[in-house]
A protein has these predicted regions:
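Residue-level detection of the helix-turn-helix DNA-binding "recognition helix"
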Residues: 26-28
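Short alpha-helical DNA-recognition segment
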Residues: 2-23
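Generic structural signal for well-ordered, non-transmembrane alpha-helical segments
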Residues: 38, 79, 83-91, 115-129
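DNA major-groove recognition helix of helix-turn-helix/homeodomain DNA-binding modules
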Residues: 34-51
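Short, charged recognition helix plus adjacent turn
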Residues: 51-84, 139-142
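Extended, charged low-complexity alpha-helical coiled-coils and adjacent intrinsically disordered tails
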Residues: 108-142
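Acidic, glycine-anchored loop motifs typical of Ca2+
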Residues: 69-76, 88-113
Length: 142
């Protein structure tokens, strides 16, 4: 997009003033409107901006595992995800989860295992989300 080659053109495409865009870029504006973050991510083909907003600015998103706003290489991200999906790890998590939930009650002694499972799932969510961001960026020509 040729408009994105200048701050004025980008500001016009975003529907903000050039000075507002400069304030966003320089961190002067403390709360960037979420609709502008979404629009910037789409215009700049930078889905990682959405991840950054959710992990850094959104009070709800801060409490959930989110992909990093700093994208690694596709190779590194894929290997990280595949490492977490090793068959023996998945089987162990599956067996523990069955044991914990089979009776419909989570006892005190099962809580440690459940916390480990939740941490494992958080890592999986984060790795899958990072690969998704890289894929979205690649599919949109980035």
């Amino acid at each position: 997009n040729d408009k994105l080659s200048s701050r004025e053109g980008a500001a016009e495409a975003l529907g903000v003033s050039a000075s507002s865009l400069a304030d966003y870029e320089l961190g002067i504006t403390k709360v960037i409107p979420v609709d502008k973050v979404v629009l910037m991510a789409d215009l700049y083909n930078a889905p990682e901006l959405k991840a950054w907003y959710c992990t850094s600015e959104c009070p709800i998103g801060k409490s959930f595992p989110m992909p990093s706003s700093e994208l690694s290489s596709v190779e590194r991200t894929t290997l990280n995800l595949l490492r977490q999906l090793r068959q023996e790890d998945v089987e162990e998590v599956k067996e523990k989860l069955i044991d914990i939930t089979a009776d419909g009650v989570i006892s005190e002694d099962e809580r440690v295992d459940l916390q480990q499972i939740l941490s494992y799932l958080d890592g999986l969510i984060k790795a899958a989300g990072e690969l998704r961001l890289i894929g979205l960026k690649a599919m949109n020509g980035g």
